[in-house]
Each structure stands twice: as structure tokens, then as C-alpha cells.
């Protein structure tokens, strides 16, 4: 049992560290770096930070309203991360002119629709369930993906 306690503390600490470190890198990129890629890099890292923050809420607030908020935040920013990554890579490789401007709006809309579907979970299509369990000193909420999650991965 003491191994579970230590492991749960390490997991929570590492997720917290990921959220804070990536958030600080995003702020640094936006404020201090004068480079053509700093905006797209900062956006990507800020989204990753918020994604980790949502996951942290799910870890520490299992079974409460905060865990559901964490699930929503994690769903929004995990979907946005793919579009932010595409934007960063296209600018990094110099191929951003091939991507239409409306693609980013489509990505934002898709991310919002996805997160609403995750939280509402119609008929268990998106998530088979959210398990609440004790993990060391943490009561964690962990979702089991459904068929809709597999479709989202293909998108």
C-alpha cells in the first residue's frame, strides 16, 4: 500500500510539474522570444499546459464537479493540441501557405463540439465510462474511451 501512496504522489507531482513548466514556457515564448515561430510554439505549449491542468483536476478531484470540469478542459485542449501542432509544424517547415485560414476555425469548432460530446456522452458513445477509484492518496477519475473516441483519433 505504501508503494501506491508514493506512486500516486509522484504521478500528481509530475502532472503538476508538466502543467506549470509548459505554462511558463508558453509565457516565456510569448513575451521574450522574438522569432516568427514563437507565437505558434507558445500557443501549442499553452494548450498542452491547459490539457495537463485538466488531467490534474481529474486526478485530484475524482467524483466531484471539479473532475467533470477537468474532463471538459482535457477534452477541449487535447483536441486543440492536434490543430496547434499542425500549425506549428506547418510554420516550422515553411508550408503554412498551403493551409487555409478557415482550418483553424474548423479546429476550434471541432474541439468545442468534441468536448461537449465528451461531457454529455450520449448513449455511452464517446466514453464507456468514467471510473472513480482510490489510487494511493488520490481519488482519481479515469475515463474508458468508447467508439466515438476511436473516431476522434481518426479525425
What residue spans do the PLM features occupy?
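Carboxylate-rich, polar loop motifs that coordinate divalent cations or form catalytic acidic clusters
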Residues: 1-3
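Individual alpha-helical transmembrane segments in multi-pass integral membrane proteins
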Residues: 5-22, 31-133, 142-155
Amino acid at each position: 500500500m505504501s508503494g501506491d501512496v508514493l506512486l500516486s504522489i509522484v504521478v500528481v507531482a509530475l502532472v503538476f510539474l508538466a502543467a506549470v513548466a509548459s505554462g511558463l514556457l508558453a509565457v516565456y515564448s510569448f513575451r521574450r522570444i522574438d522569432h516568427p515561430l514563437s507565437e505558434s510554439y507558445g500557443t501549442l505549449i499553452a494548450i498542452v499546459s491547459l490539457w495537463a491542468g485538466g488531467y490534474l483536476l481529474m486526478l485530484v478531484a475524482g467524483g466531484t464537479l471539479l473532475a467533470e470540469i477537468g474532463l471538459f478542459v482535457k477534452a477541449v485542449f487535447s483536441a486543440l493540441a492536434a490543430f496547434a501542432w499542425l500549425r506549428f509544424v506547418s510554420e516550422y517547415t515553411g508550408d503554412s501557405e498551403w493551409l487555409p485560414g478557415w482550418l483553424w476555425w474548423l479546429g476550434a469548432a471541432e474541439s468545442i463540439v468534441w468536448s461537449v460530446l465528451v461531457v454529455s456522452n450520449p448513449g455511452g458513445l464517446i466514453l464507456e465510462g468514467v471510473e472513480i477509484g482510490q489510487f494511493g492518496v488520490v481519488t482519481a477519475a479515469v475515463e474508458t474511451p468508447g467508439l466515438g473516441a476511436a473516431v476522434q483519433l481518426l479525425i
